[in-house]
């Protein structure tokens, strides 16, 4: 059994790796297909350890993402907090689903996240990027089963 301190260290390390994977510069053609690793990580911890992960983790990770790449401070923090809240609220239902159905729910969560960021960008007068920004939802849903397996391995249990 893992202590709370050990769990928080693992959550922080996986969130840091996800943040690095999210802000790592890639060629444009590959950047369009990059899954939202940070959102997937926050979703995983919010679903599997709602007390250790969750809204606070979503807010902190979103704030760090805003510092690195957000045009408006707080937009990713708000979007990740809302997605984490929904994941914590529905964590028992989501955990009981098979991987394919979880991927569909993750697709919906990623689409909601992108919509919130899209809406904030529009309200603040920042130019709306191309429709290719929605590909993150599809690639995130495809990557969810292996990502969840890797994160569950880091948690010390098998998927």
Positions of the model-derived regions?
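Terminal, non-globular segments
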Residues: 1-159
